[in-house]
């Protein structure tokens, strides 16, 4: 795993004890690539969906009996960003090199919502096996 990504999860979840393997420490897909991206959505306008439709605000919603948290606009923004990234790399390269990506969310309900959207959007069909 790229060191910048590993450092985040190592520091946040494991007290800085996890380290990247030296041979992949600086691995990236694109020369101008950023392995991890933070986007402040606190002042964002409502988001459009990948498929034209409703505007979504960046507010968390509680869902289900366990009151899991989801943020639909953040999920849409995440997938729009991923779609742009795949487009920039190129479909042929992503598929031929099996370039896999991971989306990290602290909420189980958000993870389930993201999986649902990935299945819903036709754009992601060829890439589904590469997204975790």
Residue ranges and their predicted role:
Residues 1-14, 19:
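ASCE P-loop NTPase helicase motor core
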Residues 16-119:
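Conserved helicase/translocase motor-coupling segment
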Residues 64-66, 125-132:
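Conserved RecA-like P-loop NTPase helicase motor core
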Residues 115-129:
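Extended hydrophobic/aromatic segments used for targeting, binding, or gating
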